[in-house]
């Protein structure tokens, strides 16, 4: 996230998380919140959505943010499966990555390198 803020100038960043009861997800959410606050960006609950760690979760999460008119400068995804699903749905609905927004995942899976 530091890179998204300091290099790319992102000011609206949505967190696409896994299960709200998952310990790793909660640590990533805390890091997201802490980074925003360090850079003077307000934490907004409406920019956070939890589901699961599957690719289909990224599709659901993107649809949620699009329907709520909350497309950010960047999406920070709790894992690469979510990021791939999100990127897939974004492209299906006419968005251009990275022109319209940036997406980052977590885990460094091979399939994410194609996005």
Residue ranges and their predicted role:
Residues 1-115:
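Bacterial carbohydrate/catabolite-sensing allosteric modules
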């Amino acid at each position: 996230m530091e890179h998204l803020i300091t290099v790319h100038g992102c000011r609206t960043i949505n967190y696409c998380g896994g299960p709200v009861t998952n310990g790793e997800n909660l640590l990533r959410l805390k890091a997201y919140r802490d980074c925003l606050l360090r850079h003077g960006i307000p934490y907004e609950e409406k920019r956070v959505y939890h589901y699961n760690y599957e690719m289909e979760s990224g599709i659901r999460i993107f649809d949620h943010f699009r329907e709520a008119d909350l497309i950010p400068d960047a999406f920070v995804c709790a894992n690469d499966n979510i990021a791939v699903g999100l990127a897939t749905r974004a492209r299906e609905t006419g968005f251009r990555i990275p022109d319209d927004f940036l997406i980052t995942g977590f885990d460094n899976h091979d399939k994410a390198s194609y996005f």
